[in-house]
Curated annotation (Swiss-Prot):
Domain of life: Bacteria
Protein known as: UPF0235 protein DET1292
NCBIfam families in the record: DUF167 family protein
GO cellular component: cytoplasm
Family designation: Belongs to the UPF0235 family.
Pfam family, one: DUF167
InterPro entries the UniProt entry points to: DUF167 (IPR003746), YggU-like_sf (IPR036591)
């Protein structure tokens, strides 16, 4: 299996048990995301990866939670998405485009 490229990493603040999945913006340098799933047995983590995959049109296999599996603050790596592409997509979503 070929080695993956060096990933782009982003710091997130996750708010589980929300009414719906929603990207809410930046807070203290962290991208804040509401996730509807409960924070038990990895449900919120799986829902986060699913949501990011859908939101950013990136395969789930190319998204990895590197730190914060049991906390709200997480570091997520994207193996097939550049920082520029990530920022452009997030900006467009936050602007409502």
């Amino acid at each position: 299996m070929p080695a993956k490229e060096s990933p782009f990493r982003v710091n997130l603040k996750i708010l589980p048990s929300a009414q719906r999945n929603e990207l809410t913006g930046y807070e203290n340098g962290l991208l804040k995301i509401k996730i509807a799933a409960q924070p038990e047995k990895g449900k919120a983590n799986k829902a986060l990866v699913d949501y990011l995959s859908e939101l950013l049109d990136t395969p789930k296999s190319e998204i990895e939670i590197c730190r914060g599996l049991s906390g709200r603050n997480k570091v997520v790596a994207f193996y097939s998405l550049s920082q520029a592409d990530f920022e452009a997509k997030i900006s467009a979503i936050l602007r409502g485009s």
